[in-house]
Design a protein with these regions (language model features):
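N-terminal secretory signal peptides that target proteins for export/translocation
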Residues: 1-9
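A generic structured-segment signal
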Residues: 8, 24, 145-147
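Compact, glycine-rich, soluble single-domain proteins
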Residues: 31-154
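Bacterial N-terminal signal peptides
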Residues: 13-24
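N-terminal regions of proteins, emphasizing targeting and processing segments when present
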Residues: 8-13, 45
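Short, flexible active-site loop motifs that bind/organize anionic cofactors or intermediates
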Residues: 2, 20, 126
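Sec/Tat signal peptide C-region and signal peptidase I cleavage site
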Residues: 26-30
């Protein structure tokens, strides 16, 4: 007669083992980097990462330590409105241009790192473009100037 050996595994260890196996079996779900567009802001080239989802817009440029000289982020809002930006958890000084649905810059504001101040659009904005602080001023870009290459409104 064969002997049957029973092994007792403590419940906590079995739970940990099951969790570890599930973690390795689950497919990796790394967040894909935002896609980027090549914009022309009053004729000046700007590579802009696109923040089109609520999650992407909420994160924005938070925790970024650097931004290329001609790089930025394009925020695409679901509806035109008096949208506002803040600098929570954002270590870079930035400028923001609010843009209407026709691609016309409504206003441009400078923003300081790690502040909770609200920086608001001067009119119904469909987009906002964040760049390194002073990017618009250095190129003499002003309200009324046009942005080309924006994604079409829904």
């Amino acid at each position: 007669m064969d002997a049957i050996v029973a092994v007792r595994v403590p419940r906590a260890a079995a739970t940990l083992l099951a969790a570890a196996l599930l973690a390795f079996a689950a497919p990796a779900r790394a967040e894909a980097p935002p896609k980027a567009l090549q914009l022309k802001v009053a004729g000046h080239a700007l590579r802009a990462e696109v923040a089109a989802t609520v999650e992407q817009r909420m994160k924005g440029l938070m925790f970024r330590e650097k931004l290329g000289a001609n790089d930025g982020m394009l925020f695409v809002f679901d509806e035109p409105g008096y949208h506002a930006m803040w600098m929570k958890n954002t270590p870079l000084p930035l400028s923001v241009a609010f843009v209407d649905g026709e691609g016309r810059i409504l206003n441009i504001l400078d923003m300081e790192p790690h502040t909770l101040d609200q920086h608001m659009a001067a009119g119904p904005a469909r987009y906002a473009i964040e760049t390194n602080k002073g990017w618009f001023a250095q190129r003499r870009i002003k309200p009324g100037d046009k942005v080309a290459g924006l994604p079409k409104a829904k």
